[in-house]
A protein has these predicted regions:
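Glycine-rich phosphate-binding P-loop
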Residues: 7-21
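Short beta-strand-centered segment that lines the nucleotide-binding/catalytic pocket of NTP-utilizing
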Residues: 31-44
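Conserved beta-strand segments of the P-loop GTPase G domain that flank and frequently precede/overlap
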Residues: 37, 111-116, 140-144
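P-loop NTPase switch/communication element
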Residues: 42-57
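Switch II (G3) loop of P-loop NTPases
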Residues: 75-93
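Inter-motif core of Ras-like GTPase G domains
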Residues: 90-117
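Conserved C-terminal guanine-recognition region of P-loop GTPase G domains, centered on the G4
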Residues: 99, 119-135
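Beta-strand-loop-alpha "switch" segments that mediate conformational coupling across diverse proteins
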Residues: 145-146, 151-153, 160-210
Length: 230
């Protein structure tokens, strides 16, 4: 079964692109064939770190069709969706009858939804689950980059709904030291590349490798919802 992973949360700054960069690197490190798509015309973070990433203009419906053109040719498509794009995808998927298209392609959709300590990020997840219900799979990425408290999400109705009714999965993305994030951005390096780069000393390379191992283990724990299935 083919897989379309949309990394989506209408709120900006919740870690969509950072997770996307590391998920795509996971796929490369594991030798998993895929197509990566960036849709952020202001930042294009995914394409900056992975130059082989395709770019699609969300304002152009013909370009949006390229998501499914890619899925016709690949078993896995990963798309980093820019902030404030929830309404656009809801409208577009209704226009094309998403369920019918996925059925024709032999594919499933997974919404990968980063969440942090802010209520807006939780509200956006509620909005997506209200809209799509059981039509797709859900993976929530608990992003601790700014706070390790997820009290609002943990006490929310949507978390209970995801766990009890929708088969959702939660994975964690722990905080990476600020100076390491800044250095990765300054050098335009993925963590895998940084562990072999002279700009990073021994201890920082160790920090990066430890962080990456933890995230990769989290991704693998949700592989049945993130990767193609036989």
């Amino acid at each position: 079964m083919k897989r379309l992973d949309l990394i989506l949360n209408g709120k900006g700054g919740v870690g969509k692109s950072f997770f996307a960069v590391n998920l795509v690197q996971f796929l490369k490190d594991r030798g998993i064939a895929h197509v990566a798509i960036d849709s952020d015309n202001e930042n294009s973070t995914l394409k900056r770190f992975h130059p082989d990433t395709r770019f699609l203009d969300l304002g152009n419906r013909r370009e949006l069709d390229g998501i499914f053109g890619a899925l016709e040719k690949s078993n896995l498509v990963v798309m980093d969706c820019r902030a404030a794009s929830t309404d656009l995808f809801i409208d577009y998927f209704a226009e094309i009858d998403l369920s019918a298209v996925l059925s024709e392609l032999g594919a499933t959709l997974t919404l990968v939804m980063p969440v942090n300590h802010e209520s807006d990020s939780v509200d956006q997840i509620q909005r997506l689950t209200d809209q799509f219900g059981k039509k797709c799979n859900y993976v929530v990425v608990r992003n601790a980059s700014h706070s390790d408290s997820f009290a609002l999400f943990e006490s929310s109705e949507v978390r209970a709904q995801l766990k009890d009714k929708l088969g959702g999965r939660e994975i964690s993305m722990t905080r990476l030291q600020d100076w390491l994030v800044e250095a990765l951005n300054a050098e335009n390096l993925t963590i895998t590349a940084a562990t072999k780069h002279p700009a990073f000393n021994l201890l920082d390379r160790q920090r990066l490798q430890t962080w990456q191992r933890k995230l990769y283990a989290e991704i693998e724990s949700a592989a049945d919802l993130l990767l193609p299935t036989k």
